[in-house]
Amino acid sequence: MDWVVGPEGQFNRHTFARMLSRLDDAATARIRIFPGEHHGNFNGVIHGGMILAFIDMGVYPACMLITGNEDLNTVTVDVHTQFINSGDLAKPLDSVVTLTQETGRMLFIRGTLRQDETVVATFSTLQRKIR
């Protein structure tokens, strides 16, 4: 699925013009972005702040796919991130997101950011359903 990230002028759209998304299996979704030079830092790799933004924004479409609920709306309660390797600006960046637990109001998520076989970061997050 090709997902346009919000209306023109919003942070989400400015940061990531589009994301690709698909289900890998019943509990796991893959969200892909294509980094550009504007996502880089002074060292010529993907900026850590951009990685954090992608983790946060990529969880939303992943949760919609995994739950099958296109009307799902969540807010981030908590995120824990471990930076493992630098991200290459020339390669697509995938967020592989797994729903580990769902309750009436909460979604418990684990994920990995990857470029091919390289792990860029790992994360866990708690999302609160607001509708």
PLM feature spans:
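Terminal targeting signals and extreme-terminal segments of soluble enzymes
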Residues: 1-131
